[in-house]
Amino acid sequence: MEFFNLIHPEIALGALPTILKGLLITLFVTLLCGIFSLTLGVLVAFGRKSKSRVLRLSLGAYVQVFRSTPFLLQLVYIYFVLPFFGIEIPPLPAGILALTLHYTAYLCEVYRGAIEAVPKGQTDAAKALGMRNRVVMVRVILPQAIRTIIPALCNYMVSLLKDTSLLSVVTVQEMMFRGQIYAAETYDYFTIYTMVFLLYFAVGFPGVKLVDYLENRMKKGYASRSVVTSSEETLTARGEKR
């Protein structure tokens, strides 16, 4: 009961329109950066397997830098340091750029690992049928690779949603920033931050459950495949004995 006594409904209702506008920006940034990083992650993964040594080293350096440094530092560097070199980026584009570069570096490694996990025998078999390298990649390797990493991709998208709150550091008008401003104006930090907390949870929780569901589906799929495979091997062994 003491918890609810600390919440002021009139302040919550007054703050709701402002915070919901911030939520729309949060969702917009998440969607846009998700599309960019998912797409660029594939391209960077292919680039890291390129025959060009310069391209491989350049992309490898980019991935190592962005995976080895905190996202907040990357964001601050893009917004506050690049102007010293004559590159001034407004808050929202700077936030989108930082998130995209950060998550592309991680997603490309997810893609690369999944591509390399596809058995080489399938690639050889496809080439033996006369398929070109590009066709093999699109029709044989990618469908199998992407299917196995869907839970991981969804998990990264949930993390991306949560990391949008850090854009408040560079004054992006997302949900966290608007909550901070309203809390500072009303001095009711408990009510405002509880609202922001609940809204983040309401948006992020379905994503977390989706990841759990997909992981369970993948486990069941692998289990059923292993049962079928073992049954086929048993039948084959019996046939050979006869």
What are these regions (language model features)?
Residues M1-R242:
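Transmembrane alpha-helices and adjacent helix-loop boundaries
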